[in-house]
Amino acid sequence: MRSLTVILLSLTLACTQTQELRFTRLTENQSGIDFNNKLSYTEQLNPYTYKNFYNGGGVGIGDINNDGRPDIFFCGNQVSNKLYLNKGGMKFEDITEQAGLMSQNVWSAGVSMVDINGDGLLDIYVCKSGPPGGNKRHNELFINNGDLTFSEQSVQFGLDNEGLSSHAAFFDYDLDGDLDCYLLNNSIKSVGGYDIIKNQRNRPDSLGGNKLLRNDEGYFNDVTQEVGIYASDIGFGLGVTIGDINQDKRPDIYVSNDFFERDYLYINDQQGGFNEVIEAYIQEMSKGSMGADFAD
């Protein structure tokens, strides 16, 4: 028994000594990234007055200048959004101001880096959340000008939503060659402000409900109702996942809802719409979902 103990101890020490470090932490001085999404309480704005106070901000990674190096965009809640240009060698430069992306008195939640207009350059779509108010309350679309600057054009593209947006997923749901948008919105009402009754999820809400926006020659039209997407204000959406669930080569949609509402699974009907069928696919579902992923 003593010999066995010595052998096991030797093996443990050998494994410990040969274990390689997989990651190395870089300081802000090394990387140039000093973003800090600092939150401050006020009597008017705190976790009790705003249920998503601690939900955080999104991060987008993409190559904005096609130099082969991924750049980083950070969403700020009570601080400005930040865009960092990858200079190579894990060195980044803050180009937020010169890029025209400084933000003030807005609550940014999610970000998507995607080529909206098909010009080969990544654009930036920022979802706004937090307490409604202010003249910059709507979501913002920053079109890449090709010179490390961006122009806000959400109105021109029909993407200036003013709900409590959490995130946006861009994908070609109708396979017509352009990107459409599933906009994930959080409810504008308090959690305790509902009386759950039958078919309440079938009652659309213009601000609190999710939206499916179809890209029609560069303008995003709201087709939520006609394609079978729930747009009620009982869905506290925190995650949207796109994938081909039934392997028919058509994109399907999974929506993760926080609090009491169940999740949604939309199967693409191959005719321009969706069927919500989660109860046929999943027998048991958790409450308070905050995200999902597809994998084999």
Which residues fall in each region the model found?
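Sec-dependent signal peptide recognition
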Residues: 1-8
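Hydrophobic h-region of N-terminal signal peptides that target proteins for export
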Residues: 8-16
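Acidic, glycine/proline-rich Ca2+-coordinating loop motifs
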Residues: 15-296
